[in-house]
Curated annotation (Swiss-Prot):
One of its GO terms (cellular component) is mitochondrial inner membrane. Heme 1 (or BL or b562) is low-potential and absorbs at about 562 nm, and heme 2 (or BH or b566) is high-potential and absorbs at about 566 nm. Component of the ubiquinol-cytochrome c reductase complex (complex III or cytochrome b-c1 complex) that is part of the mitochondrial respiratory chain. The b-c1 complex mediates electron transfer from ubiquinol to cytochrome c. Contributes to the generation of a proton gradient across the mitochondrial membrane that is then used for ATP synthesis. PANTHER family: CYTOCHROME B. Its cofactor is heme. The gene is MT-CYB. The cytochrome bc1 complex contains 11 subunits: 3 respiratory subunits (MT-CYB, CYC1 and UQCRFS1), 2 core proteins (UQCRC1 and UQCRC2) and 6 low-molecular weight proteins (UQCRH/QCR6, UQCRB/QCR7, UQCRQ/QCR8, UQCR10/QCR9, UQCR11/QCR10 and a cleavage product of UQCRFS1). This cytochrome bc1 complex then forms a dimer. It is a multi-pass membrane protein. The chain crosses the membrane at residues 34-54. Keywords: Electron transport, Heme, Iron, Membrane, Metal-binding, Mitochondrion, Mitochondrion inner membrane, Respiratory chain, Transmembrane, Transmembrane helix, Transport, Ubiquinone. It is found in: Mitochondrion inner membrane. GO terms for molecular function: metal ion binding; ubiquinol-cytochrome-c reductase activity. The lineage of its organism: Eukaryota, Metazoa, Chordata, Craniata, Vertebrata. It comes from Anser caerulescens (Snow goose). This is Cytochrome b.
Length: 74
């Protein structure tokens, strides 16, 4: 039987130990996984909100060009 490359290759071994064979307790519930997904969504929304806020102009004469710039270039 050939050794598993996932457990013998140095780089794949590091990825395997941290992501695939996760060193986590076996009694983690589905709520823990759901909460981590919610945290990822929250961080994504905060980062995209900050990105859009940096490209927004509140001046009435520049408002349309600001939205057009956001739709075109961001």
């Amino acid at each position: 039987m050939a050794p598993n490359i996932r457990k013998s290759h140095p780089l794949l071994k590091m990825i395997n130990n941290s992501l695939i064979d996760l060193p986590a307790p076996s009694n983690i519930s589905a709520w823990w996984n759901f909460g981590s997904l919610l945290a990822i969504c929250l961080v994504t929304q905060i980062l995209t909100g900050l990105l859009l806020a940096m490209h927004y102009t509140a001046d009435t004469s520049l408002a349309f060009s600001s939205v057009a710039h956001t739709c075109r270039d961001v």
